[in-house]
Design a protein with these regions (language model features):
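Structured catalytic-domain cores with a bias toward divalent-metal coordination
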Residues: 1-119
Length: 119
C-alpha cells in the first residue's frame, strides 16, 4: 500500500531515510549548499539495496522536477517497504531521492538557478 504523500520536503526526506534503513539499504547523502523553505538542510539521498558489485542495476529517481518529488518519494518508499531486510535477490536497486532538493522543498519544477534538470 502506498502511504499518503508527505506534506513537506523535510517530512518526505525523513520518511525516505527511515524506509531505506528498514530495508537494510546502504545510504549516502550529498548535502546541498542552500536551505529549504522551512530552513531545513537539503540533500540528495541515495539508498542502494542488493549486491554491491552486481552486473545489473535499476535506477529509481524522484524529484528531478522538484514539485514532483512528493509523488516520487511516496512510490520509492512503497517499493522499499517490499524489500524486507536488505536480502534482495536480483538486480541492485539504487534509489535517488530528491535529485532537485531545492525545487522539492520550495515546490518548484526548477532548481535554485531556475534550471529544469530534465531539459
Amino acid at each position: 500500500m502506498i502511504e499518503p504523500l508527505s506534506s513537506s520536503y523535510a517530512e518526505a526526506r525523513s520518511a525516505f531515510l527511515e524506509a531505506a534503513a528498514q530495508a537494510g539499504s546502504r545510504i549516502e547523502s550529498f548535502p546541498h549548499p542552500l536551505k529549504g523553505l522551512g530552513g531545513e538542510d537539503l540533500a540528495i539521498d541515495v539508498a542502494e539495496v542488493g549486491p554491491i558489485d552486481g552486473d545489473q542495476v535499476v535506477l529509481v529517481v524522484s524529484g528531478t522536477h522538484g514539485v514532483e518529488g512528493y509523488c516520487g518519494s511516496a512510490l520509492q518508499r512503497a517499493h522499499l517497504s517490499t524489500l524486507g531486510d536488505g536480502e534482495h535477490a536480483g538486480p541492485t536497486l539504487v534509489f535517488v531521492h530528491a535529485l532537485n532538493p531545492y525545487g522539492f522543498s520550495w515546490v518548484r519544477r526548477v532548481n535554485e538557478d531556475n534550471i529544469d534538470l530534465n531539459r
